[in-house]
């Protein structure tokens, strides 16, 4: 009976120790979330089919380091004008970038926005930028009626 009394007396301390260890392990497992290398949102604003359309590409990253990115558009039919412009910018965690293109077409067109992570000096502050090992080209496609 005496040994049973000692077992019940030590139990709350052991339970508290196990609880603390479990909470510590759970917290360590939560810190292993993966960051999004690049998030892209492509919007096409068009009032009427005979008028000019504006293509807006918003690019953001969850990385702590900055990257030099080059953004451009591709299409299934040739389009003239500033559609062919390429934008180079520094993409950092707290500063998403928005790129704008104006285009005019009379038919349905599939537009692909491409963002390349490149190595170029003089774009990011103090030339501090990273290049991902896994992937350096990202794209998103939409149709413009």
From Swiss-Prot:
Modified positions (Pyrrolidone carboxylic acid) in chain numbering: 29
One term of GO molecular function: aspartic-type endopeptidase activity
Pfam families registered for this protein in UniProt: SVA
GO biological process, one term: regulation of immune system process
Intracellular or extracellular location(s): Secreted
Keyword check for Signal: yes
Summary of subunit composition and partner proteins: Monomer. Interacts with AZGP1.
Main subcellular location: secreted
Protein name: Prolactin-inducible protein homolog
Keyword terms of this UniProt record: Disulfide bond, Glycoprotein, Pyrrolidone carboxylic acid, Secreted, Signal
Superkingdom to which the source organism belongs: Eukaryota
Tagged with keyword Secreted: yes
Similarity-based family: Belongs to the PIP family.
InterPro entries for this protein: Ig-like_fold (IPR013783), Ig_E-set (IPR014756), PIP (IPR007990)
GO cellular component: extracellular space
PANTHER family given in the database record: PROLACTIN-INDUCIBLE PROTEIN (PTHR15096:SF5), PROLACTIN-INDUCIBLE PROTEIN/SEMINAL VESICLE ANTIGEN (PTHR15096)
Disulfide bond entries: 66-92, 90-124
Glycosylation sites: 106
């Amino acid at each position: 009976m005496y040994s049973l009394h000692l077992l019940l007396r030590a139990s709350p301390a052991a339970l508290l120790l196990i609880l603390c260890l479990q909470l510590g392990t759970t917290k360590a497992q939560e810190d292993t979330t993966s960051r999004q290398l690049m998030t892209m949102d492509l919007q096409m604003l068009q009032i009427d089919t005979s008028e000019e359309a504006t293509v807006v590409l918003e690019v953001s990253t969850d990385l702590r380091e900055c990257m030099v990115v080059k953004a451009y558009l591709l299409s299934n039919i040739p389009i003239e004008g500033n559609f062919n412009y390429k934008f180079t910018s520094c993409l950092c965690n707290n500063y998403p970038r928005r790129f704008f293109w104006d285009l005019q077409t009379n038919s349905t067109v599939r537009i692909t926005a491409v963002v390349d992570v490149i190595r170029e000096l003089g774009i990011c502050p103090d030339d501090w930028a990273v290049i991902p090992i896994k992937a350096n080209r990202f794209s998103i496609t939409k149709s413009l009626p």
